[in-house]
Design a protein with these regions (language model features):
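Short, low-complexity N-terminal regulatory "tails/caps" that precede and couple sensory modules
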Residues: 151, 161, 165-168
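Intracellular, membrane-proximal regulatory regions of polytopic membrane proteins
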Residues: 11, 33-35, 44-50, 57, ...
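The conserved cystathionine-beta-synthase
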Residues: 5-29, 34-36, 53, 73-101, ...
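Bateman (tandem CBS) regulatory domains
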Residues: 1-17, 58-73, 130-133
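C-terminal structural cap/anchor segments
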Residues: 16, 30-31, 40, 45, ...
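Short hydrophobic beta-strand motif reused across regulatory alpha/beta modules
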Residues: 41-49, 106-115
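Soluble N-terminal domains of membrane-associated systems
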Residues: 46-51, 63, 125, 166-168
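Solvent-exposed, non-transmembrane regulatory segments of membrane-associated proteins
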Residues: 126-148
């Protein structure tokens, strides 16, 4: 799970403190999801920290700046891997929110996560430095860079096969 959770009544300064703890150079910033008790309300990015003077960070809450959870790219955890690849490639960040069957946030998925799943399924283990480098750049590990193109060609091939069967 690579997202953080903050209660909606927390001051923006808390968001700033979370960001200082993130090791962005290693894997990119975590998403910050906002809740009120057991209810998911949305998410917040760093824009309020850039737009507001530091003096306002203790007066405004993260809940004042939340965005709807539905605005994050997402995929259900039961989706086949090819759908996850399409969702990741369609997202601006190269990452999607994974939703449980109940529609609740369960984690995130990026290119490296997909690459690890494919390699594991194939029984291939790459050295840790190679995996770390791919994670740092949010890229597929070597040998899997063609996954998006392969997945993109799948619907075209299946549609063409359907047309050929219909014409015979």
């Amino acid at each position: 799970r690579r997202f953080r959770v903050i209660e909606s009544d927390q001051p923006l300064r808390k968001l700033s403190q979370l960001r200082l703890q993130d090791d962005e150079a290693k894997r990119g910033a975590d998403w910050v999801l906002i809740c009120r008790g057991p209810h998911w309300l949305g998410w917040v990015d760093d824009q309020p920290l850039r737009d507001l003077p530091v003096q306002q960070w203790d007066r405004q809450t993260v809940g004042d700046h939340l965005r709807p959870l539905e605005s994050l790219p997402s995929v259900v955890d039961s989706a086949p891997i090819w759908q996850a690849i399409k969702a990741v490639e369609a997202s601006q960040q190269g990452r999607v929110l994974v939703l449980s069957p109940a529609g609740l946030p369960a984690g995130t998925l990026d290119r490296m996560d997909i690459g690890e799943a494919v390699l594991k399924r194939l029984g291939v283990r790459l050295p840790a430095p190679i995996l770390d480098e791919a994670r740092r750049h949010n890229s597929y590990p070597m040998g899997l860079v063609m996954l998006p193109q392969i997945v993109a060609s799948m619907p075209a091939n299946s549609e063409q096969s359907d047309r050929e069967r219909a014409s015979t």
